[in-house]
């Protein structure tokens, strides 16, 4: 797989299938943790050679666009966006240089694959059944993988994630373990409304976590400190894709974001 960046389009599809199979094995081998809510913790999500290429072939800062939603409220006073993103869909990354495009095309295709989705659904069954009932496996899930970059000043207060989301996955992409203290924090909400910190993910190379979104999946991130240049990760979100409204919404958002992205490249 170390030749990913020079493969033809056909061979990239085959490489994506192989990468998806590796990710499925990582999901199947992940640790299941019950508290403060059911979640998975990953080690070695990607093969070592692919992970090394991902670090080497990160997009330039100008390739990213602002992340909206909760992140927008934490822009710096001068207007600098503390979280930016690139959607890892073919139509978004096609403007990247050929070597970078080839790699991130493989990564994006693998993350959006059916085997990876089914692996998450299988391993997150306790959380999904709690929300959707015994027929949780029949609930449609629409994957959206985005490469995110946070800079010092970024933070997000405790929240559960919107009900539009079914599964939240974050895969960390640091070069080393020098700043393991900036990982996502998990909380437990007590009867008095307080939300003490119960655990924190380590921001370590090639690690991550996943959970089925529910009304108890409280999580946050402390401000990224100045010892960090960037906090890079992949957010893989599975949006609930069940019913006409949600199906149209998910595809409409993808189309709308594509139009905005194309406009940005043309001005």
Residue ranges and their predicted role:
Residues 1-35, 250-267:
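Fe(II)/2-oxoglutarate
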Residues 1-26, 89-110, 145, 161-167, ...:
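Short N-terminal signal/transit or membrane-insertion segments
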Residues 6-13, 73-79, 124-128, 160, ...:
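Short, mixed-charge, low-aromatic patches
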Residues 22, 26, 53, 57, ...:
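Residues that form generic nucleotide/phosphate-binding pockets
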Residues 29-123:
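Non-heme Fe(II)/2-oxoglutarate
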Residues 73-80, 140, 144-148, 255-261:
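Amphipathic alpha-helical surface "interface" segments used
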Residues 85-92, 192-194, 215-219, 254-259:
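A general structural signal for short secondary-structure boundary/capping elements
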Residues 100-236, 240-248:
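Catalytic core of non-heme Fe(II) oxygenases with the double-stranded beta-helix
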């Amino acid at each position: 797989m170390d030749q990913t960046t020079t493969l033809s389009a056909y061979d990239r599809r085959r490489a994506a299938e192989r990468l998806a199979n590796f990710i499925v094995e990582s999901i199947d081998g992940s640790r299941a943790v019950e508290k403060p809510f059911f979640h998975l913790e990953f080690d070695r999500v990607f093969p070592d050679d692919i992970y090394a290429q991902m670090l080497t072939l990160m997009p330039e800062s100008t390739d990213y666009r602002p992340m909206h939603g909760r992140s927008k409220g934490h822009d710096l006073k001068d207007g600098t966006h503390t979280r930016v993103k690139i959607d890892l869909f073919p139509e978004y990354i096609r403007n990247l240089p050929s070597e970078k495009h080839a790699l991130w095309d493989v990564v994006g295709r693998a993350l959006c694959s059916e085997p990876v989705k089914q692996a998450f659904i299988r391993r997150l069954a306790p959380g999904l059944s709690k929300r959707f009932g015994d027929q949780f496996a029949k609930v449609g899930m629409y994957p959206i993988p985005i490469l995110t970059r946070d800079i010092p000043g970024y933070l997000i207060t405790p929240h559960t994630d919107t009900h539009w989301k079914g599964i939240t996955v974050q895969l960390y992409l640091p070069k080393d373990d020098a700043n393991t203290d900036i990982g996502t924090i998990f909380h437990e909400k007590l009867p008095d409304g307080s939300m003490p910190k119960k655990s924190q993910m380590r921001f370590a190379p090639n690690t991550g976590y996943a959970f089925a979104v529910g009304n108890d999946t409280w999580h946050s991130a402390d401000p990224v400190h100045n010892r960090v240049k960037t906090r890079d990760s992949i957010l893989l979100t599975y949006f609930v894709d069940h019913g006409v409204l949600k199906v149209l919404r998910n595809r409409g958002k993808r189309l709308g974001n594509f139009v905005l992205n194309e406009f940005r490249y043309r001005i």
